[in-house]
Amino acid sequence: MLEGPILAVSRQTKSVVDIPGAPQRYSFAKVSAPIEVPGLLDLQLDSYSWLIGTPEWRARQKEEFGEGARVTSGLENILEELSPIQDYSGNMSLSLSEPRFEDVKNTIDEAKEKDINYAAPLYVTAEFVNNTTGEIKSQTVFIGDFPMMTDKGTFIINGTERVVVSQLVRSPGVYFDQTIDKSTERPLHAVKVIPSRGAWLEFDVDKRDSVGVRIDRKRRQPVTVLLKALGWTTEQITERFGFSEIMMSTLESDGVANTDEALLEIYRKQRPGEQPTRDLAQSLLDNSFFRAKRYDLARVGRYKINRKLGLGGDHDGLMTLTEEDIATTIEYLVRLHAGERVMTSPNGEEIPVETDDIDHFGNRRLRTVGELIQNQVRVGLSRMERVVRERMTTQDAESITPTSLINVRPVSAAIREFFGTSQLSQFMDQNNSLSGLTHKRRLSALGPGGLSRERAGIEVRDVHPSHYGRMCPIETPEGPNIGLIGSLASYARVNPFGFIETPYRRIIDGKLTDQIDYLTADEEDRFVVAQANTHYDEEGNITDETVTVRLKDGDIAMVGRNAVDYMDVSPRQMVSVGTAMIPFLEHDDANRALMGANMQKQAVPLIRAEAPFVGTGMEQRAAYDAGDLVITPVAGVVENVSADFITIMADDGKRETYLLRKFQRTNQGTSYNQKPLVNLGERVEAGQVIADGPGTFNGEMSLGRNLLVAFMPWEGHNYEDAIILNQNIVEQDILTSIHIEEHEIDARDTKLGAEEITRDIPNVSEEVLKDLDDRGIVRIGADVRDGDILVGKVTPKGETELTPEERLLRAIFGEKAREVRDTSMKVPHGETGKVIGVRHFSREDDDDLAPGVNEMIRIYVAQKRKIQDGDKLAGRHGNKGVVGKILPQEDMPFLPDGTPVDIILNTHGVPRRMNIGQVLETHLGWLASAGWSVDPEDPENAELVKTLPADLLEVPAGSLTATPVFDGASNEELSGLLANSRPNRDGDVMVNADGKATLIDGRSGEPYPYPVSIGYMYMLKLHHLVDEKIHARSTGPYSMITQQPLGGKAQFGGQRFGEMEVWAMQAYGAAYTLQELLTIKSDDVVGRVKVYEAIVKGENIPDPGIPESFKVLLKELQSLCLNVEVLSADGTPMELAGDDDDFDQAGASLGINLSRDERSDADTA
């Protein structure tokens, strides 16, 4: 249950412009936003601050609501709700209060290394009162370790970083809807009263015009039965509802005379088969709707009901239904059915009568991380409450203490269950800084109490007008979750009730004011809102007579300027952070923009990051708030700087040292590395970025590289979105990334003795052991490839009866001679790299290990992956493709000054996909690289000079530009600037005014017949790397049943020769090849051993036998009681068993043990 004005609302953070040392971007923005984007992690941080009641949060609340305001945190709320817990007789009670935390036990790095939680011990004050003796006992009780949020908005659970995603749910309240009856085609109306916790109450008018009620989804009964059960007389019902014929006819036909009969009637419908009594029936009705323990509207439900029905009043403490609520709901329903448009509420207010749209954001609210954890703690405490009651009854009253009553296990189990298994607690996406940031701002309609992807229809997934400025209409996944998972818009924040608000500038009588109001979707419906690019003069007066505005339900209209109430604060208000980083978004089709927003999250951080020539102005802020940069909170002078740490002497004389994270593995296996940006002796200001993180450059989000791109077909090699790259990109490591894999092995106690980590491995040459140290662990810096030993380990074998010779050896050499198996950890198939880290945990060193584990070793292997054929590249406009060919630099097309292009994209990738933004980005990219100089005196530049800001008339080569979404560079500006681009050092202008250049074929030296569009595009290397997908096998594991190879790279499986491949072989008449593929190369068990023998002995390949899968098919048919047998040519039944003697003999002669265990790592063929 949400409490008061307590749930944190996002606070304004430092403006981007104030970030010291920020790189300059030349912006084409025409609209200046009156406020900056709120803190991008406030959604997570503020909600958690409310839950645990941090001192900063309390200070903010007091500042907002005054010193005297009562401020309670989320945990305090639940303890108040639960207390006091009384025994069944009411003689004893236990109250819990004052939740408080001790210091966190381990640092974040220790928690990650030791695979434990980053958590703080939670204590509460428990007070036991014996009402008969008046005795009070008070104790501090330890509730358990409570996971704490890091300053980046994440949790460390069992050593891995996780994010709790905010959940979009239907808000508690009262909802009216309309359906059309199929038989009569008349509109029928219904209403649901939905609580936060408790039974649903539903009223409806059926096709026979009777008003009915359903309690808790049970059988329908006349609504007047419920009213009479509540104590209403026929006269009272007639007085209140006499205006409605359908209510009067329902009253006449309800068949109950008084309150007692009505109560018994309800009881019979709710509990069929039980013998009703008046008291039972009364308590059933009371418990259903009027007892706070069983029924809870929550503050948000009470707020929605009062607002919808015009009931006024605060009703702050009243979280159950009242008779007035029920009566007004029924009146609203019958007036709605009668076609009335307005009604007068009980307190005299005129309210509109209309149905509700369940997909409207006024009816959907967010459960943020604090509320989700609070609900889970509530579940745990209610389980604990039952235990406390039982113990109060069974224990001796004299000796009871609070500690003896409380069993904290249900609470800690509920918290552990939520973080470990809930659909909303997710493994954090750490592919790059942006993916982590957008993961924390994700909104999910799935999860407990939400929708399921199977049942969700088109309507709930679709974009709704009320999403504007609250949830991004573009950023959503492409699969079965489309529309169910969204992203918070850039300016949005969450209000105390959990509704998403977005800011607007107040307009009074056609004049802008400095007032910024945050409106919910419900409130916004009552106002007329203008666009952010509405023209106004220096005093704020709107200059246009008529203004384009947005009305209720997303309708667009033209109205007089005095009719406008509000104006958008920024053109990028409607999109999320990820989408706001797509330049020229306004020129892209929404489907491709969706792919572009999603693919930015899949970009791998490169060894050398580079800021985009063409940005949107959001890069700085996204990187700053993502939490991967090192930012100094103090001003001072850099005293010491190295790759590992930076020391700053602050102005107040204190030294601050910042440790940098070097080459650590992320959740997705990419490399997390921080690099210093400051120099020794440099002056730094508070809030300045002093070190870059992964995928950032100079404190800006930099996920890819600026590449010189040409749009042209090239010998068919870039057909169907294939990409041609310059070999130079490979050689200069322009698209090279580092990937880190973690390999873990443990030495356990087995029934036959303890496993041992050792260098002494049986039957292994010294050459193989060259990189192992004396413990048997690989040294740091060793280059390893697949099959190399990382950690030597031996496991005791089951011992058989020893021969006299073995007994003699055992007597001479002791234990060393006993039988052990080599179970060393080796580099998996297909992996190579350099060992960059070793972690050794041992029980002897008092490390906390799992039961039965004596030692655990983790090896980190880093791999430098250059770009290669088969890797996936993408731009920011959904223009993705796979590298099809890497050409030598001398074969690439080149500009007249000799500059070869980096990448060739096919022209067919543009028109059909309607993502023209990529072409405009290419043109502006060239301009940013070459620079431009506009002569204001030149008459040809007259129009350009009018629209361009003064600082954009002269821009040097290699500058960074920003073209904000919906407010960027126009086509006219781009073509005007292309005509004024700066020449190269030889004085030649390479690209014409139309953005095209004459390219020369690198192979022949001849110019191409037509000019080619050329410029710089920002390209990302995506996580879909060919190294992780390509797979080949010669011998490997088999399935025991079918005797066919397993499938998939993870199982080291074979290639499936499927139905269509068989048809291809048949089409070419390749009968023998096909027979081999289906038998001896696959599952003809006898045949494949004989073939192995024939190859070894140099004989001819024998005829194939019967495949094992055919035998399996026969067995399956026989198991269905079908008598299936194989007949020979003369019609006699054949026995399918192979010649096992030959089979075993052949195997033995080849040294193959055919009777060994079927193990995936041992059984190879």
From Swiss-Prot:
GO MF term (any one): ribonucleoside binding
Gene3D superfamilies linked: 2.40.50.100, 2.40.50.150, 3.90.1100.10, DNA-directed RNA polymerase, beta subunit, external 1 domain, DNA-directed RNA polymerase, subunit 2, domain 6, RNA polymerase alpha subunit dimerisation domain, RNA polymerase Rpb2, domain 2
SUPFAM superfamilies: beta and beta-prime subunits of DNA dependent RNA-polymerase
Parts of the chain that traverse the membrane: none
InterPro entries recorded: DNA-dir_RNA_pol_bsu_ext_1_sf, DNA-dir_RNA_pol_bsu_external_1, DNA-dir_RNA_pol_su2, DNA-dir_RNAP_su2_dom, DNA-dir_RNAP_su2_hyb_sf, RNA_pol_bsu_bac, RNA_pol_bsu_CS, RNA_pol_bsu_protrusion
Highest taxon listed in the record's lineage: Bacteria
Keywords recorded for this protein, A-Z: DNA-directed RNA polymerase, Nucleotidyltransferase, Transcription, Transferase
GO biological processes: DNA-templated transcription
Pfam families membership: RNA_pol_Rpb2_1 (PF04563), RNA_pol_Rpb2_2 (PF04561), RNA_pol_Rpb2_3 (PF04565), RNA_pol_Rpb2_45 (PF10385), RNA_pol_Rpb2_6 (PF00562), RNA_pol_Rpb2_7 (PF04560)
Enzyme Commission code(s) on record: 2.7.7.6
One GO CC term, this protein: DNA-directed RNA polymerase complex
PROSITE patterns: RNA_POL_BETA
Reactions this protein catalyses: RNA(n) + a ribonucleoside 5'-triphosphate = RNA(n+1) + diphosphate
CDD domains, sorted: RNA_pol_B_RPB2
Coiled-coil ranges (or none): none
UniProt function note: DNA-dependent RNA polymerase catalyzes the transcription of DNA into RNA using the four ribonucleoside triphosphates as substrates.
Complex formation: The RNAP catalytic core consists of 2 alpha, 1 beta, 1 beta' and 1 omega subunit. When a sigma factor is associated with the core the holoenzyme is formed, which can initiate transcription.
Cross-referenced PANTHER family: DNA-DIRECTED RNA POLYMERASE I SUBUNIT 2 (PTHR20856)
Similarity remark: Belongs to the RNA polymerase beta chain family.
Protein name: DNA-directed RNA polymerase subunit beta
Gene this protein is translated from: rpoB
